[in-house]
Amino acid sequence: MSKNKPLGRKLRLARALKSNSPVPAWVIIKTNGKFRYNFHRRDWRRNDLKV
């Protein structure tokens, strides 16, 4: 991908980067293990971003 990106694409990539994290340990404890996985996790090789 090019170094110079439009602002909209840059913001969408930043949002995708932030949402690609696991569920924090304190959330798992607080919800008694109800939310154990982040089902929106994405691997950079396997899944393609529509940006």
From Swiss-Prot:
Q: Cellular component terms, GO, for this chain's entry? A: ribonucleoprotein complex; ribosome
Select a single GO molecular function from the record's annotations and give it: structural constituent of ribosome
Q: Which residues cross the membrane?
A: none
> A Pfam family matched by this chain, by name?
Ribosomal_L39
Q: Which InterPro entries match?
A: Ribosomal_eL39, Ribosomal_eL39_CS, Ribosomal_eL39_dom_sf
Q: Name one GO biological process term.
A: translation
Q: Which domain of life is it from?
A: Archaea
UniProt KW keywords: Ribonucleoprotein, Ribosomal protein
Q: Which family does it belong to?
A: Belongs to the eukaryotic ribosomal protein eL39 family.
Xref: NCBIfam families: PRK01242.1 (NF002316)
Name recorded for this polypeptide: Large ribosomal subunit protein eL39
